[in-house]
């Protein structure tokens, strides 16, 4: 009687909910057919399971079976199963072989960007004044993620408050966008732009639209004085009554000279 055991890998990595399959090679090194019992010991939360409970192999021959390990849904990135021990035992009750494998949790990258509560994405800003918009950035993954940001279709007077954020799993942080339109920003036009977030694995998420509407800045000018005419001014012209009086006086003088 004799037996040997090996696996295709000693360790594998899967995302939460994923299943890691290990292929085991078992060899009968004895000189007769033998049936080997298969047992698996390990962290029960990871559900280590063999594809079969025993295997029959001819003399000096080999065969395979599979051990599957399921990563629990609630595991954070980097969490490990610990050793999972697989043992095959000969029918003689004495010849055995074992091999340890393990599984680690890979990181899931999942970013969401949304308008903050009570903000529909549209804001009005006056020329040569500053205004801040904010977006909520949420890490729905299972590990900390350094997220970088870039703007898309933005006007020249819009800028990010931060180029990157480190966000923990399940955490939400605000991202600020600064608006500082000059007098060249056109009133009556909607400036529509977005923010693109890139996770550490290179995956991208685009924010909903942000819209900036421009108000023209009011400027101080000279006070305009309006002169109101009296109702008895003929033709509505200032000084017209005086002109008529002078004309009448001239006619009278000329008449007297003729006399």
Predicted regions and their residues:
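Long beta-sheet-rich domains in secretory-pathway and surface-associated proteins
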Residues: 1-259
């Amino acid at each position: 009687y004799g037996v040997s055991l090996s696996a295709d890998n000693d360790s594998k990595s899967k995302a939460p909910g994923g299943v890691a399959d290990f292929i085991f090679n078992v060899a009968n090194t004895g000189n007769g057919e033998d049936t080997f019992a298969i047992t698996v010991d390990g962290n029960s939360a990871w559900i280590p399971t063999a594809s079969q409970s025993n295997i029959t192999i001819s003399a000096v021959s080999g065969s395979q079976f599979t051990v599957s390990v399921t990563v629990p849904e609630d595991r954070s990135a980097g969490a490990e199963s610990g050793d999972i021990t697989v043992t095959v035992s000969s029918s003689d009750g004495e010849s055995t072989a074992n091999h340890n494998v393990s599984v680690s949790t890979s990181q899931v990258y999942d970013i969401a960007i949304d308008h903050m509560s009570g903000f529909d994405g549209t804001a009005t800003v006056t020329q040569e004044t500053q205004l801040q918009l904010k977006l909520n950035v949420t890490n729905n993954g299972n590990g900390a993620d350094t997220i970088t940001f870039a703007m898309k279709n933005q006007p020249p007077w819009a800028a990010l408050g931060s180029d990157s954020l480190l966000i923990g799993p399940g955490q939400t942080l605000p991202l600020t966008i600064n608006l500082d339109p000059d007098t060249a920003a056109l009133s009556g036009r909607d400036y529509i732009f977005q923010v693109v977030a890139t996770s550490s694995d290179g995956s991208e998420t685009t924010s909903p639209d942000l819209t900036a509407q421009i108000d023209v800045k009011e400027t101080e000018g000279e006070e305009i004085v309006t002169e109101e005419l009296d109702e008895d001014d003929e033709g509505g012209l200032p000084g017209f009554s005086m002109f008529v009086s002078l004309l009448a006086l001239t006619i009278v003088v000329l008449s007297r000279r003729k006399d």
